[in-house]
Amino acid sequence: MENIPMFTNEYGVASLILESVPYRKEAYIRIQSTLEPEKLLEECVKFCTLCGAQRIYATGHEFLEQYPFHTAILQLKGNRESLGETDASLFPVTEKTAEKWRNIYNERMKLVDNAAWISFTGMKKVLKEGDAYFVHRNGELLGIGKAKDDRLNAVASVKPGAGADVVHALSHALSSETVTIEVASTNERALRLYERLGFLQVAELSRWYEIPQNNL
């Protein structure tokens, strides 16, 4: 299911993230501009529900603060040099290994709040971007991730205790000494890892709220 970057009606503009609906029954609403947030939200929720969403989350307006808090997206920054070294190696994802990478990503991220779901079509975009990797040590798969410029766009370990090595290895694909990553505030395990590696929270990028589908 395709996302709708500009969902427009008489009440305003919002972005609808629908890619997870077929798999996790979740939809996300990002309010862009409105003078009538309640009515815009109602229309967005109706549309997401018609698409099959059973859980809906929204961000982008103070009106939403009346609803139950879901998670916040935090921006963390660290120094690549301070991450240390690892003997783990990076292997870029290819067309032959793309489906394996996608399956691992979706499996590891399915319980992470606000994590994207990558469809078969979405994986083609990942391949085109060329920033997806497997992380191995001596032939053993430690994890996967996405890394480009100054950002770690995804980190997932498949071996217990290998998270630090996966982060270290992925950082070698970056062109910047400053490493930036975004993490859900409810992903406590990841936050503990990044804190241990010297990352500091520098911003709260968004706050997401759970929207009831029957009480609007």
Summary of predicted features, one role per range:
Residues M1-F7, L111-N138:
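Active-site rim helix/loop that mediates acceptor-substrate recognition in acyltransferases
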